[in-house]
């Protein structure tokens, strides 16, 4: 696998970009998660960033990437509506793993947003998408631009939802390379990694949460529910960061 030219690939139509990356992805599928990170750092352009929602399994990708690339900027888009346990988890992991945390937020405070638009998350799919655009997408786009990112690592896994089931290890999103080192990991592999490295799940894992986002759009898992149904009232799985 050789070095890839981001500018040249960005000039191609989306379908052609996917095809151009197909051979590389076929080879990346044969590598371990650690090998994928090393390959990306050697063959993809910097600057490099890692995004995290500090969700249930966040410690895995944070530890994995940070141990290979210490001091990599870790982007958190903070909506202001995260669980208290999430903010505590952020502090704990930032200290334990010595993370170079970069927090980005919407230009409007949560209270100001509610005054202007009402509770967007109660306004169906359209309202949820507007909420996500304001609180997740715009701050992430700003982060990528301000940090001059050209390669973006994230901790998505195919097993998490139907919308992620066919994601490749390497893609181009928002004009930058996006690398998903643990995309093919199952829940057992996640558990084993956490145990091996003395890491914890998010505190709400023990209370029955399989996925954690904002307080108002996250539900505990109940028998018969798919993991993706615990977010956004089952109307959608993605918050907007990993779409497009």
Swiss-Prot record:
The keyword Cytoplasm applies. Its main location: cytoplasm. GO terms for biological process: hydrogen sulfide biosynthetic process; sulfate assimilation, phosphoadenylyl sulfate reduction by phosphoadenylyl-sulfate reductase (thioredoxin). It is found in: Cytoplasm. GO terms for cellular component: cytoplasm. It is an enzyme of class 1 (oxidoreductase). Pathway: Sulfur metabolism; hydrogen sulfide biosynthesis; sulfite from sulfate: step 3/3. InterPro entries: PAPS/APS_Rdtase, PAPS_reduct_dom, PAPS_reductase_CysH, Rossmann-like_a/b/a_fold. NCBIfam families: cysH (TIGR00434), PAPS_reductase (TIGR02057), PRK02090.1 (NF002537). This is Phosphoadenosine 5'-phosphosulfate reductase. The gene is cysH.
